Amino acid sequence: MNILNKVKVKAKWVIALPLCFFAVLPSSAQKQDDMRQTVEYLASQKLGGRYPGTAGDTLASEFIVDKLRSLKLKPVVKGKKKKAFYHDFTYGKEKQITTHNIIAVVPGKDKHLRNEYIVVGSHYDHLGMGGQGSGSRRPDTLGVHPGADDNASGDAVVLELARHFKKARSQRSIIFMFFGAEEQGLVGSKQFLEWMKQEDNQRKNLPDSMKGIVAMVNLDMVGRMRDSAMSVSGTGTSSRFKAMAEQAAAQTGLHISCVPDGYGPSDQASFVAVDIPVLFLTTGGHMEYHTPDDVPSTLNYDGMQQTLDFSKELITQLASMPETPDYISVPSSQTMKHAKFKVTLGLMPDVMGASRIPGLRADIVVAGKPAHQAGIRSGDIIQEIDGKPVKDMNEYMERLSELQPDTTIPVKVLRGEKMLTFQVHLTPAKK
């Protein structure tokens, strides 16, 4: 090689290296852009809130199926290609509604472990136009409830997980599932598990029975991350889950709050009810929850990227662990949450415990209710109620159970760096 050729080679490297460097950069940005586009479509006015059985529900399911088909994932139903990714079901007593779960599979590459399946899921339905009995926090106001965080955010992350694991195939098989009618009482996840209990020669690429499902990971409301914090429930439902979650968090820079049991108001509860270990990821509640204001512009897309990175690490560990995940029955930490109280403060606390600051954050303080009238605001971190400390949700519920209506009690909160005390006049809780 002569000197001129050496110069040419060096020049090529000088040019090529920056090009290679810049070629890597768009990857994360592209994923965020893809997730943003998914959220913006699913939470658009055009889809009308994605209520089961409506035109918006159909458009949402078609959008997701098109994505899965473009990724060349395996369908689950024999016969017509158009219905290959749909598990249809009908529910309701007074009014029958037909909708579906959307399901696709990435087969595992290990000849033994590929017969064990992990479900990675999110629900794609929402509240439609809201109204009385819909679950809306503004039941007297009819309007599209877009459901950007609940749960277009989860759908966007699960689609990116499907893209990732299609390329980086895992040892175990992964079922990617988008549940219908979750807001109606976890209907889709329950219907899927009932389907898996039955013999059906129209199924394909799924385990022969429910016993082939060894774990479930659920993502619901993962679009409003704060302070790089996330709640992971179900960490006690299998021996290694807590250590795996902590390792994934350390690798991705997340601060996680681990909740041992897998119960709660989302689809993982259907799986833990039939003794399948679960992990439930969420970034928690907010003022826009179940209102027309849950729109795409309120989401933290950098945080969704962090959720995606964390989920990849967690699922990779889960899909490659040599032993089958064991199931451990964990008592529900929700017991006190469903107790009846004589009073209400009129706030929604951070039930996931995602805040790293001591105390219990008031995620939503309802206008006109006792806490709001006293001066407490969303984001305040409760330190004491009636002179007794509040460190977590259980202590909050315990304090609430001790209070009587038509009394006034001090509530101490941390707001920024200031410790404030408000006198709250308690009103009777609705029966």
Where are these regions (language model features)?
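Acidic/histidine-rich catalytic neighborhood of metal-dependent amide-processing enzymes
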Residues: K95-H100, G128, P139-R240, P260-G264, ...
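Bacterial N-terminal signal peptides
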Residues: V14-V24
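Active-site-adjacent substrate-binding region
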Residues: V222-S329
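Sec/Tat signal peptide C-region and signal peptidase I cleavage site
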Residues: L25-A29
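Extracytoplasmic/secreted proteins, especially bacterial periplasmic and envelope-associated proteins
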Residues: Q30, D34-Y41, A55-S70, A84, ...
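Bacterial N-terminal signal peptides that target proteins for export
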Residues: N2-I15
